[in-house]
Amino acid sequence: MPRIAVIFESSPFDRKGLFNAVHNRIKGLLGTGECWVDAYCIHSRDNAFTRAVRHTPYAPVVDSVEIEGITYRMLWYRFSILDHLLVEKFGKRPCLFRRFVKTYVKYLDGYDYVIAHSFTGALFAYEAKQLYGIPYFASWHGSDVHTHPWRVQVIREDTQKVMEAAECNFFVSKALMKSAGKITLNARKEVLYNGVGEEFVKFDKAGVAKAREQFGIAPGEKVGAFAGNLSAVKNVLVLPPIFKTVSEQFSEPIHFIIAGDGKLRSQLEDELSSATHISFLGNVEAEEMPALMNCVDVLVLPSLNEGLPLVCAEALKCGANVVGSDVGGIAEVIGHHNVVPHGPDFVPQFAKKVVAMLEARNDSDDFAGQQALQQLPPEISWAKTTARELSFLA
């Protein structure tokens, strides 16, 4: 039975897309009974000043965290302003973080394989291969391909290095794999979709009514929603004009929900301060997301860049419909007819699709009819992902 180390940078204290994807990948591998898996989670330590500057939530410094029977050994590094300046201002490699990698890579010694998620995880895996000869697989989820390598040349160079040294690189969408071709053509690449957790299911009528009451939605109101980081890459500043246009063009009462937090939250709240029927929920606990998705009629995702947005797949599994921008892997989840290309008419065209989807739901007011409007592609399945990932380890 092979011994596998899974290593990645994320937060078990604020579980969102990347963490949930890795967690479900680990669950899938363990569930086969065909391998032993240990999980290592890399996490930065901020003081009060750097936390305020970076808008990072407080995280308790603990040795390990257990979630659903999986123990994550925490590898802590202190966020360094010196390293930040070296990379972001001077285009140099960080010195303190490199020391952190060389100090803690010893934990990977003795494994048969390393599976790395995120650029930081891949750096550890690369170092383990150089020191101990351990083969590794690197999974790429989005910004570590389409954004960060293009900010700073040394990040692009190191991304190329770790991609080319991997046994195989897995990308969560065809679009992301295509984007990686701009980084290197000399690495093995495969698409390996993420799946959707079993907890994301369509509730019965009583369950939906309870969820709507929980989130303060009045009877008879339709629900439009955004869920994600309130950041520039998510293009959240177009939400106010989209919501306004939808409200003007859709004849029924509609309640808009914004779930998430981030640097642009205050600006969004200011721009929507005079609007009615708007709810800012902040960060929603992972356990509450299925209930929220069961309240949603149409989820909107106007991002400037994406890998494979699991929030779209989760919404579809709960009976919502989704309209998104034509970037990354969004169309691979929700269908090419349900995305809007960025351009001068983005807001009116996006709002038009949202209104059309709301009206179509009125004509298909049951789960089967709503699913017929949009179906989750069958390849977005944890069972298929696990089987395929395991086949590479055979």
Regions found by a protein language model. Name each.
Residues A116-G121:
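Short His-centered aromatic/hydrophobic patch
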Residues L268-V284:
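Nucleotide-activated donor-binding/catalytic signature segment of Leloir-type glycosyltransferases, i.e.
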Residues L304:
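Aromatic "clamp/platform" in nucleotide-sugar-dependent glycosyltransferases that forms part
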Residues N321-G324:
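Short hydrophobic beta-strand element within catalytic cores of glycosyltransferases
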